[in-house]
């Protein structure tokens, strides 16, 4: 009898190992499974001149894992410049469109999956998420030139105000809280640490942005890169992610995005 039970247990375990991950894990207990529609807004493709590829991919992964449907959007306009990510300097011979660059995230389905930000209607979605990257301060706003007095891309400003007015969740990672704090009143956000407390694990080189959001009237809350801060009143969820520069602790960024998405999904169910 014991031998038979052991054999059955072994066979059951073997069957589970062969099952696709999606059959073993149906996501979190957040949102309306399979019926939550999220708009994800990109600003190009690449940390130094658009949306960071890790933050973009992690956002789409966690949305998928939690049963959300999502569509990707970007402004149909030219980038401020194109950065050579090897030399860390602008390329003088290149000029690229944010929407065309963001289509790189569409798994080769740009014509079907990529959307012009000017067409984004808050009435058609349950929430919006802005992953980070220097496109936030170069393409979606003039922060890289004007600092705290920056202006936002017209459609970026409209979308943020529309979702806020509709009491729908807004997810923001790394630099993206700058956008919301510039045009929405009395927000509570996190962009990580307020001082560059460098360690052998990483550092916080963009604390000037933290001071900027505070000068815009927002309340800043210190959080680790793997955490999220939830402004329940305004339904704004932020996570520091790559405000923290690290050479290899990317799992912290993955977890930070996951926590942000979890709370976005939770709030869509309210």
Curated annotation (Swiss-Prot):
It comes from Danio rerio (Zebrafish). This is ES1 protein, mitochondrial. Keywords: Mitochondrion, Transit peptide. GO terms for cellular component: mitochondrion. The keyword rRNA-binding does not apply. It is found in: Mitochondrion. PANTHER family: ES1 PROTEIN HOMOLOG, MITOCHONDRIAL, ES1 PROTEIN, MITOCHONDRIAL. InterPro entries: Class_I_gatase-like. GO terms for biological process: mitochondrion organization. NCBIfam families: PRK11780.1 (NF008747). It comes from the Eukaryota. Gene3D superfamilies: 3.40.50.880. Its main location: mitochondrion.
